[in-house]
UniProtKB/Swiss-Prot annotation:
Residue positions binding 5-phospho-alpha-D-ribose 1-diphosphate: R51, G52, D106, D107, L108, V109, D110, S111, G112, K113, T114
Name listed for the protein in its UniProt record: Xanthine-guanine phosphoribosyltransferase
NCBIfam families, per database record: PRK09177.1
Enzyme Commission (EC) number: 2.4.2.-, 2.4.2.22
Role noted for this protein: Purine salvage pathway enzyme that catalyzes the transfer of the ribosyl-5-phosphate group from 5-phospho-alpha-D-ribose 1-diphosphate (PRPP) to the N9 position of the 6-oxopurines guanine and xanthine to form the corresponding ribonucleotides GMP (guanosine 5'-monophosphate) and XMP (xanthosine 5'-monophosphate), with the release of PPi. To a lesser extent, also acts on hypoxanthine.
Superkingdom to which the source organism belongs: Bacteria
Annotated gene: gpt
PANTHER family in UniProt: XANTHINE PHOSPHORIBOSYLTRANSFERASE, XANTHINE-GUANINE PHOSPHORIBOSYLTRANSFERASE
Pfam families hit by this protein: Pribosyltran
Subunit and interaction comment: Homotetramer.
Amino acid sequence: MSTKDPHRLPHEKGFHISWDQIHRDSRALAWRLDGQGPDEGAWRAVVAITRGGMAPAMIVSRELDIRTVDTISVKSYHHQAQGQAQVLKAPDAGLMGDGTGILVIDDLVDSGKTLELVREMYPNAHFATVYAKPKGRPMVDTFITEVSQDTWIFFPWDMALQYVEPYRGTD
């Protein structure tokens, strides 16, 4: 008879991302986006989807020397439960227009609901994520790594280092 651990996440797989790995993968995303903008290869601005997209957006904007950076705040998760996506804060309307020349960056596309909402607002923006799951993949234009739908990604900003008991216990 198995008992369910109430403290265990409902996801079957966990993928732990370190700060070093998100930095490397975000730089790889920048390299993939370099020269792909509509203005002789250049991008006008970067818009980070908060909060997860902020670290990758900072790295991409640095690597591509893009000085204009804004945010869009979309809430679609409460802890690990996904809900209805809603915009809490939109970027500057004058900057955005229809999204032409704008890189919208997030850490992950999961179901695609967040990107779908933002894409409706800015249909000509280029959507880039570091990681992508199969359900959300059609919503993203560029990504670095695909993971299975049942994988839960643990980002470094959500983690803390702590002592863990040895597997076999202690004396």
